[in-house]
Amino acid sequence: MVRKSHADETGQRAPDMPYVFFPIARHRLTSGRAAALLVFGLALGTARAEVGELVLGVAPLLSETETRAQFQPLCDYLAAVARLPCRVGTRPNFITYWETVRQGKDFNLILDEAHFTDYRAQKMKFTVLAKIPNTVTYSLIIPRAAKLSDPARLAGRRIATLGIPSMGAAQLNGLFTKPSKQPILLEVDNAAAGFALLRDDKVAAAILPTPLVREEIMRGAPFRVLLSTAPLPHMGFSSAPDIGPELRQRLRQALLDAHKSDAGRAMLARIGLERFDPANATVYAGQGRILKEYWGY
């Protein structure tokens, strides 16, 4: 288990239901017709009362402000499909996000990393609808000028990572398996904070999602990649059990067909994706085991 410190220890090196209304008839209804209308009304009311709004939860890889700005176009697109309001929800860091995940109340749609997607599918009966295409890795990065080629030499030194139980923290644990040769995990709230610590020489390295690392380096950041982890299924989009089958299928199809419509393509461009791919729980099966292996969840 990687030893842990906190981002403020900078000098230490150590280790909602709608009613359905019918106009009052001017003539008497037969009992059969009245019953039919009643059944229809109840069914419609039930269908519409599954959820009062969509709340799209997103893992806190970015800051709360950045996450809401980045994914509101996706929320707006789904709101139009569902004819329900939609808002983006996230948390300031992974430890508070994890508490929200385990309670299972705040988000009824979620775009999340592989291990959390599997956890929800297995433990909370969420349904996987789609995923971001391809796979994703994490990259261990160091300053460009650092004369370091062996990750083992980072033992005893500070490495910035997204907080426990993020995938980044799990990947860092997997890199350093010897109890006597551990780095010091320095938890950060989001990727930008990790980049800042590395740029200011407050950590020797950082392990962060490779797509974000690539963007940062392309913007001129003085970093280089020491290694990248084995690929994982990219982030999955899943729905909570209170999203009924009909709405769930509409949302799934809207995601998978987004690249075929003007509105969908505009949304994808704004969130930086080409498309969503089909996915189900099998894609993520077994990924949640790291939550138990490393942290006992």
Feature roles, as predicted:
Residues 52-61, 67, 134-142, 218-259, ...:
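Periplasmic-binding protein-like
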Residues 34-43:
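Bacterial N-terminal signal peptides
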Residues 111-123, 199-223, 231:
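A ligand-binding cleft/hinge motif common to bilobed small-molecule-binding domains
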Residues 88-100, 184-196, 231-233:
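Short helix-initiation/N-cap motifs at beta->coil->alpha
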